[in-house]
């Protein structure tokens, strides 16, 4: 009985000696799993190494494509399948006919003929005025006044007049 106990203890000891140098004894299954990409961030951005949620990258939905028009399926075997009609060609563009009568003229009435230009009469000069402006016609204009006899014009002399006129200078008494 004691030998069996010693034998099992020896096996455990030997297994521990072989597993420790290989580096497999201290590893748990949680260390062997790959890191979760959602909760991993660089250390320089998260120095405390707390779990940070990185949302997944948004992908837009695929673009909408309209369904392709298919020819209608003919279920009756006797009838021919209905074909889609091609679009009709456009008629060629025609210019409108030119108007033979003026606009807003009834059709039974003929438009008036253009009259030839008459020669203009020669221009006459207006008659000259016989009386002054702003004078009533029954009143005669005043006659010009005769010139007044004026004395002949004298030239100014350059001589200085005497300081006291024609009187003698006053006597000064000391």
From Swiss-Prot:
Induction: Induced during preinfection and infection stages of nodulation in root and nodule tissues. Induced during root colonization by endomycorrhizal fungi in inner cortical cells containing recently formed arbuscules. Induced by Nod factors. Induced during actinorhizal root nodulation following symbiotic association with the nitrogen-fixing actinomycete Frankia spp.
Region (Disordered): 28-174
The UniProt record lists the keyword Signal: yes
Keywords: Cell wall, Nodulation, Secreted, Signal
Tissue expression per record: Expressed in cotyledons, leaf vasculature, stomatal guard cells and trichomes. In the embryo, expressed in embryo suspensors, the epidermis and underlying tissues of the cotyledons, hypocotyls, and radicle in maturing embryos, and the outer cell layer of the endosperm.
Positions with biased composition (Basic residues): 122-132
Record GO biological process: nodulation
UniProt entry tagged with the keyword Secreted: yes
Cellular localization per UniProt: Secreted, Cell wall
Gene Ontology CC: one annotated term: extracellular region
Bias (Low complexity) ranges: 70-83
Signal peptide: 1-25
Start-end of Pro residues biased regions: 53-65, 134-150, 159-174
Transmembrane segments: none
Biological role: Involved in the infection process during the plant-rhizobium interaction. Involved in actinorhizal root nodulation. Involved in symbiotic association with the nitrogen-fixing actinomycete Frankia spp.
Family from the record: Belongs to the plant proline-rich protein superfamily.
Protein name: Early nodulin-11
